[in-house]
Structure formats: structure tokens, C-alpha cells
Amino acid sequence: MRELPHVLGIVLAGGEGKRLYPLTADRAKPAVPFGGAYRLIDFVLSNLVNARYLRICVLTQYKSHSLDRHISQNWRLSGLAGEYITPVPAQQRLGPRWYTGSADAIYQSMNLIYDEDPDYIVVFGADHVYRMDPEQMVQFHIESGAGATVAGIRVPRAEATAFGVIDADESGRIRSFVEKPADPPGTPDNPDEAFVSMGNYIFTTKVLIDAIRADADDDDSDHDMGGDIIPRLVSDGMAAVYDFSNNEVPGATERDHGYWRDVGTLDAFYDAHMDLVSVHPIFNLYNKRWPIRGESENLAPAKFVNGGSAQESVVGAGSIISAASVRNSVLSSNVYIDDGAIVEGSVIMPGTRIGRGAVVRHAILDKNVVVGPGEMVGVDLEKDRERFSVSAGGVVAVGKGIWI
């Protein structure tokens, strides 16, 4: 087995996630449940741990209690071996202020870097759904001789306004990096696609420290990794791009190779769940060679009684479907669906109860929602807009603990 370089993982998990409201009303975006058994942060942590990067600091800020608890309960590594995944809330080490941006979060947490003294630093976001082997990107970074490496992926040009757009030469050196342009340029071989940043970076340690310090002294900076740090290093000729399509994950299928989803909106979050439910899913949760680790609750198996059924669906542990019909849906743990209820094309989070004869369609129900007997969600959008959030794509989102 090849000896790994000394790498520190920093996961940026302070995102507020306003576009995912109401799912982020009571929790940080990386703590939002996903896929029936996980939270969003589990994907980046699984990728790092599977690659044997076992010294990880998770920088948190916004409503971080459930995120901190999830990490502490479900991501315990061997302290005796010097391994750790530790949530680090804003420490206010530099005065009575919170993080003002992702770069400022690292600046205020520089003691973590000094204590670990790594050769390289992996800085990844905490709110994307994907599999990736970070070791391959680190090796690319080392061989390229760059000071910073940005993971890049092709997306439709119409969607690129939400990302940092990359232009690189044939060797992979980045010539320009524009954060969230109004009119993104297409790629040379396909004008309808753009090459964008995934928000995952590798840095040589000294390069990151110097860039973060310089940014902290710049009063005109927004102190953002994508908006300020990467453009600074691009202008210095120190940044390269790693093409995510070259990343080979053990056990990946042809369908889910290169799968990556930004789930920052209700529609994107919903669509990513629908990617899970087909017989041959676009994203396969069942890859045992690169497992996604999540909640470790000790729950009974799911149960179907009185003719209850689920088709093309994911059903979490502890759930009971009684004489009800579930289709094309993702149910988390401890969901109860009563006699005659119909759930179609929906995402149901832990502890939710759907009453006798109720109908739920094209909806996201957060934790501990109670849908009363005969009630309907996602059937009459005009009525739903008066009481819930409805996305541009017509997805009805019901907040945590609401009784209907």
C-alpha cells in the first residue's frame, strides 16, 4: 500500500442554505437528511475516510447543534491512532465576530493547521451528493506542481451562473476563474456546457497560509474561497484544475460514474432523491466498495403489513407501511404510513406520520411531520402555497414538526 502524504482535511460546513428553506429553518445545510439514512455531510466525510484521510476538521457556524451531534455520534475514529473527525464551531479567536466567509473561517482556524503541520490541505464543501476518491486528486496536485488545485466538472451552461467558471490551458493550469458569472462562457468543444468548480480544493500548505493571510489583510475582499482565494492564486499562476470525470471510484457503475449534484435548492434536492429510486439508479447507494456511512441508529427493519407496498422506492429502517401505497419515493427511518394512504414521488424524513387515506405527491416532508387522515399535500398547489413552501418546479416542502 502506497504511503500517503501528510494531509489535513478541512470541511467547510457553515453554510446557512437559505434556498433550502424550510429544511434549513432549524439546522445547518450540511445537516439536512438525505437518501433515507444519511445527512448531506456524510458524503464528503465518507469520501475522505474511504481515501484514508483520517484527520479532519469540520468548520461549523450556522445552527450547528444537530450537525455537531451527528458527527460526534456517528463519526468516531481512533484517537489512539491520531485519527479524528472533529466539529469546530466559530471560536472568535480574533475578536468578537463570526466567520464572514469561507476563507475567513479558515483564517480564524489557522491554529488547526499549525497544530497538525500537514504537507497538503484538502478543503472540501459539505453539501454535495457524490462519490470521489480524493487521493487521486491529491496525487494530481502533487504531480502538477501547482500550489492549488480546483476540482472541475462540466455542467449545462445555463446552470453555470451558480458556480465558479474555469478556463484552463491544455496542461490544466487555470487561466481565468470567474465566480458566478451572469453569462458563463462555454467550453471550446461544446458551447452549451461550462467547466465549473465543484468547491473542492487541494492546497500545498504554505500556499494556502500565505493566500489566507493576504486575503485577511484585504479590506475589499469578501473573504470567500471561490470568490477571492482561488482568483488570487489564478492571477499568480499557481492554480490547476483536476477534471472530476477522470476520478475512478471503486465499484462505480457506468451510470453513476462522475455523478455529482449540488442540492442547494428544493428542486435540486428533490431531483437528487429521484435519482436514487429506479431499478438501475443514476446514483447507486449500494456500492459496498466505496460505502457512504450515515446514521448508526439501532432500529428494527422496515415492515409492510395489511397489503402495504412500496415500488421503486427507498424505505428506511423502523418504517411501517400499513395497507398503504408508496411509489417512486424515499422514506427515511421511523416513518409510519397508515391504511389507504398514497405517497408518490415524495421525500419523507424521519419520524413522519401519514394518516389513514391521506395523499402526498411531489412533496418533501421534513422530520416529525404529521399528515392527518384524509389530508392532501401536493394535490392542490394553490392551497399548498398558502400554508407551505412551493418551489419553482412545483415541489411542496413542509417544515419540521408541522401538523396538517
From Swiss-Prot:
Pathway(s) it belongs to: Glycan biosynthesis; glycogen biosynthesis
GO BP terms: glycogen biosynthetic process
InterPro entries xrefs: ADP-Glc_PPase, ADP_Glu_pyroP_CS, GlgC_bac, GlmU/GlgC-like_hexapep, NTP_transferase_dom, Nucleotide-diphossugar_trans, Trimer_LpxA-like_sf
Protein's UniProt keywords contain Glycoprotein: no
Keywords, sorted A to Z: ATP-binding, Carbohydrate metabolism, Glycogen biosynthesis, Glycogen metabolism, Nucleotide-binding, Nucleotidyltransferase, Transferase
EC class of the enzyme, as a word: transferase
EC number: 2.7.7.27
Catalytic activity from the UniProt record: alpha-D-glucose 1-phosphate + ATP + H(+) = ADP-alpha-D-glucose + diphosphate
Record-linked HAMAP family: GlgC
Name of this protein: Glucose-1-phosphate adenylyltransferase
Organism: Mycobacterium sp. (strain MCS)
Name of the gene: glgC
